[in-house]
């Protein structure tokens, strides 16, 4: 008589492990043909044991259990009453594409977690993959009366924790998340608070901690760049950029900021391909000239790359959202309801330059984003004259600037757009 035993466990993350399963096994069947429903998403190793009385054979199978909500576009959006929603546009399978089917979940947070609401949504962030191939958190920050940060499992949107920042640091809310970092002590995203200080949001414990050496810095904005799989955090105010260490949070002093004393920072962008470079767009205080600086790879020194007088108003300001791509040596940004394309070392487009993209009449650009494969640019818009939902998403090809797809009137005013990639 042949005996069968099906069991499963979690994968052993060590590449040198002799056995592929970590920890205990759960036996789920002794039938030749297995029928079993998993109740949790995740990665598993299934083991089949076959015993004919004379020999025993083991076979192993890798299983990826998904929720059906594992890939698509996320749009954080807010209405006139400051009620925010996280809308999810599920990526279609080839079969669904052929049928023309589309799944849009207007309020994915409330659908999965009844009773959980977002007020005054500010920022949205998905952490990078960790060593086991999973990303630990999807987080949404808000400017509600508690400074709430909502943490969810990005695979299925299940609530992990609602952290009320103001209960730990009175009067403080998160203005922006600033990229992902990891060290021997954990994984975290940096963020800047409304008090001008820098904080660390721990993605393992879902807690927040003040970086004490930043208490009196008065930073106004956060920016993060990515190069390969590395993230770089930058916090800045009028003429000073702070670049905290990327490994251990306390290994260097953030207070030793890199100063551009004679200039006022307009915006900055981290190059996505070629070499690791931070470009800083400034105005010289003495003559209002536009000056482009390239920051060194150590982020401590500047090289002036372009210095010119403004003959026409520059089509860029501190509110321009900068979007880079590995597919091009150029980047995109928005200004005055248009999208411009810019080559880092060249002059900034002016208000009379031809834009790369102009949205349909009546649409006001509120934010930009990009697809995970970096082939597409997302343009979030708001049309106050539209009935019903006033927000839309337009998707353009990075290379050609052609419109690929539009979703009109599906959200309120878009605040942040991200692509949630498959685990």
For the regions a language model picked out, list residue spans one by one:
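Blade-terminus and WD-like Trp-Asp/Gly-His loop motifs, strongest in beta-propeller folds
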Residues: 132, 324-326, 370-372
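Entry beta-strands of beta-propeller and related beta-repeat scaffolds
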Residues: 69-75, 135-138, 187-189, 276-280, ...
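Tryptophan-paired
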Residues: 98-136, 147-153, 160-163
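Beta-strand initiation motifs
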Residues: 14-17, 94-106, 156-162, 205-212, ...
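Conserved blade-ending motifs and adjacent loop-strand segments that build the rim/top face
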Residues: 307-320, 349-373, 382, 400-417
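Hydrophobic core register within WD40 beta-propeller blades
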Residues: 86, 122-125, 175-180, 268, ...
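Acidic, serine/threonine- and glycine-rich low-complexity intrinsically disordered segments
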Residues: 145-338, 343
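Acidic/polar, low-complexity intrinsically disordered N-terminal segments immediately downstream
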Residues: 1-116, 382-401, 406-410, 415-423
């Amino acid at each position: 008589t042949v005996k069968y035993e099906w069991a499963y466990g979690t994968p052993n993350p060590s590449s040198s492990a002799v056995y592929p399963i970590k920890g205990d096994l759960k036996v789920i069947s002794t039938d030749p043909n297995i029928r079993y429903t998993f109740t949790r998403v995740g990665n598993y190793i299934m083991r089949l044991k076959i015993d004919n009385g004379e020999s025993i054979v083991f076979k192993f199978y890798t299983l990826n259990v998904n929720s059906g909500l594992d890939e698509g576009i996320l749009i954080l959006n807010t209405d006139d009453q400051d009620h925010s929603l996280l809308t999810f546009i599920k990526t279609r399978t080839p079969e669904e594409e052929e049928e023309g089917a589309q799944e849009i979940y207007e309020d994915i947070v409330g659908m999965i977690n009844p009773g959980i609401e977002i007020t005054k949504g500010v920022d949205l962030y998905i952490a990078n993959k960790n060593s086991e191939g999973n990303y630990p958190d999807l987080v949404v920050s808000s400017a509600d009366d508690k400074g709430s940060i909502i943490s969810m499992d990005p695979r299925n949107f299940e609530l992990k924790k609602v952290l009320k920042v103001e209960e730990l640091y009175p009067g403080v809310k998160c203005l922006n998340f600033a990229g992902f970092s990891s060290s021997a002590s954990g994984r975290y995203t940096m963020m800047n608070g409304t008090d001008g200080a820098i904080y660390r949001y721990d993605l393992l414990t879902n807690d927040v901690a003040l970086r004490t050496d930043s208490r009196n810095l008065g930073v106004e904005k956060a920016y993060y760049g990515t190069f390969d799989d590395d993230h770089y955090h930058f916090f800045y105010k009028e003429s000073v950029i702070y670049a905290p260490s990327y490994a251990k949070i306390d290994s260097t002093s953030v207070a030793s900021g890199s100063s551009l004393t004679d200039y006022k920072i307009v915006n900055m962008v981290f190059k996505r391909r070629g070499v690791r470079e931070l470009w800083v767009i400034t105005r010289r205080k003495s003559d209002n000239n536009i000056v482009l600086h390239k920051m060194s790879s150590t982020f401590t020194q500047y090289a002036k790359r372009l210095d010119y007088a403004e003959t026409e108003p520059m089509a860029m300001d501190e509110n321009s959202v900068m979007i880079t791509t590995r597919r091009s040596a150029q980047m995109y940004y928005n200004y005055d309801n248009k999208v411009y394309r810019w080559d880092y070392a060249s002059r900034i487009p002016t208000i009379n330059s031809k834009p790369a993209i102009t949205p349909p009449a009546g649409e006001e650009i509120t934010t930009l984003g990009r697809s995970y494969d970096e082939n597409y640019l997302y343009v979030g818009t708001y049309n106050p004259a539209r009935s019903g939902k006033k927000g839309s998403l337009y998707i353009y090809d990075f290379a050609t600037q052609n419109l690929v797809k539009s979703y009109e009137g599906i959200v309120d005013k878009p605040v942040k757009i991200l692509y949630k990639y498959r685990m």
